[in-house]
C-alpha cells in the first residue's frame, strides 16, 4: 500500500496545542493523528485511525486465540438493566443520561456487564453451553468531570471488554488466567512497559482484581513494588500491616491535659515534648498521636449522608483515593463547617473518638489502631488532649478502613522487603466478578444433575485508544513519535529530498517496489515542501523506518534510518532487499 503525503488529509503543527499537558497529547495533535472536537472528545484523523485499527487487530487476535467470540452491543442502552444492578445510581454523575421523545431513560454505555449477562440468559439454558467467553471492541462514554491528557482521559474512548461465563469457580479461575496471559501477550507485542498490580474491584464488585499499569511519570495511578519479591499493587489496594495488639491491663492511665494552641499534629508534638510527656520512656513523635478526620459517606440511592470519623496515626496523611476506593460504591466527602455547627459535640481541632462513640457516630480506624494501643488524641474540648487513650478500653471502632497514605519504604507484605512507589497509566483491568450480575439478572442454568445453577462471571477490559496514547507516551523523543512496527500506520516513510528528476523518478520506482513486497509505505512526494520540513515531519510522524533520497543519491546511495538510530547509506540497488530483510527479522 502506498499513501502519498501530497494527497493525505494531514496538517502537522510546529507548536504544542495550548491545552496539552502530557507528551502523548501534544504529539498526537501536532502530528495530525487526532483533533479535538470538544472537551474530552477527539476526531480520529487518517493516520490516527490507521494506528487505532492496528491496535484493535492485536487485541482481536489475542482474544480470538483464547476462544473468545466477538459481538457488538449498542452504545445507546436502556435504563432498566442498570437499575437491576443498581449502577444507574452507583455511577453517579459519570453516566451520560438522556431521554427519548417519549420520556424513556437511556444512557451511553460506560461498560456492558448488564448487556452480556442479559444476552447469555436469553440464549443459553444448559450447562452444555458453557463455558463461553464473549467480547466486543466498542466506544464507551463517561462524563469525566475534568477530561484531560487527550485520549488518555477522555469522555469518549475505545475499549475491548470481554466476559467469561463458567459453571464453577474453578472454571472462572481458568478463564481469568487465560485472559491474564492474553493481556500479557498483547502488551508484549506492542512493546509496552507495564506492571501487573493487585487492585480494588470498586463499583464493579467481585473478588480477585488486577490492573495492568503502563509505567509512566505522567500516570494518574500510583502503584507500589516490593524491593525483595514479586509483590505489586495499586496504592488503593495496598493492605496496611495491622498493629500489634497489647494487653489492656498493661495500658497506661488515660490523662487529660490542657494543650494551648495545639490544633495541629505538629503543635501537639511540640507541646508534648516541651511538657515532658513521654511514651514508653521516649519523646513523643507524630506517630504516637491519633488523627481524627470527619467525613460524610453517602450510600448509593440514599438521600442523606452518614457522618463518620476516620482514625489514623498522626504521622500519616489521608489519601483520598484510598479512602474513596475503600467506601465504593458509596461516595465520601469531608465534613463541612455546617456539620460542625449542627453537631456541637464536635470540637474542631480537638475531636477524639470518645465523643464519637458517645453520640453514635460511626468510627472507622486504620489497621494500626488495634486493641491495647495507646494514643494522644483530642479530648473533645478546646485546647485539651488525652494522653494514653487506649483502644478497646477508652474507645471502640466500628470497623477498619484503608485511608492512610502509603510511603516509600513502608514494609512490604510477606517479608518482601520494603515498598517503592511509582506512577502508571491503567491500560487493562481484569476481575473475577463472581455471581453479582448473573444473580441480578436471574441467569439460571440447568446443571449436570438437572438442578438450577447460576453461572459465575469474569470481566476483562483493556483500553484500545488508551493503549495508543500510552505508546506515544512511552515511545517518543524530543523530535516526535516512535511507533512500534506492529501498529505503526506505515512501516516505511520514503522522503524525496532531492528535486532532480532522476531522484523523483527513483522515488516512485522505490515505493512501487516496496509495495510489491506488501510493505505499507508513506511517500513524501510533496513538490513544494523543503527538505528540512520533510525531515521534521518524518521525525514527528514516527514511522519505524525512514528512507531518504537526498544528496547521497547522486553517488548511487540512499539513506536508511531506523527510528531512533543512526542513518546508514545503502546502495540504491540494494535498498529494497535491505528494507525487506529488516522488516522480516
From Swiss-Prot:
Residue ranges of the TM segments: none
An MF annotation (GO) of this entry: proline-tRNA ligase activity
SUPFAM superfamilies: Class II aaRS ABD-related (SSF52954), Class II aaRS and biotin synthetases (SSF55681), YbaK/ProRS associated domain (SSF55826)
Gene Ontology BP annotations: prolyl-tRNA aminoacylation
Domain notes from UniProt: Consists of three domains: the N-terminal catalytic domain, the editing domain and the C-terminal anticodon-binding domain.
Catalysed reaction, written as an equation: tRNA(Pro) + L-proline + ATP = L-prolyl-tRNA(Pro) + AMP + diphosphate
Subunit relationships: Homodimer.
One GO location term (cellular component): cytosol
EC numbers: 6.1.1.15
Chief localization: cytoplasm
Swiss-Prot/TrEMBL keywords: Aminoacyl-tRNA synthetase, ATP-binding, Cytoplasm, Ligase, Nucleotide-binding, Protein biosynthesis
Top-level taxon in the UniProt lineage: Bacteria
InterPro entries in the record: aa-tRNA-synt_IIb, aa-tRNA-synth_II, aa-tRNA-synth_II/BPL/LPL, Anticodon-bd, Anticodon-bd_dom_sf, Pro-tRNA-ligase_IIa, Pro-tRNA-synth_IIa_bac-type, Pro-tRNA-Synthase_IIa_type1
Protein function: Catalyzes the attachment of proline to tRNA(Pro) in a two-step reaction: proline is first activated by ATP to form Pro-AMP and then transferred to the acceptor end of tRNA(Pro). As ProRS can inadvertently accommodate and process non-cognate amino acids such as alanine and cysteine, to avoid such errors it has two additional distinct editing activities against alanine. One activity is designated as 'pretransfer' editing and involves the tRNA(Pro)-independent hydrolysis of activated Ala-AMP.
Species of provenance: Corynebacterium diphtheriae (strain ATCC 700971 / NCTC 13129 / Biotype gravis)
PROSITE patterns associated with the record: AA_TRNA_LIGASE_II (PS50862)
UniProt record similarity statement: Belongs to the class-II aminoacyl-tRNA synthetase family. ProS type 1 subfamily.
Protein name per the record: Proline--tRNA ligase
Cell compartments where the protein resides: Cytoplasm
Pfam family, one: tRNA_edit
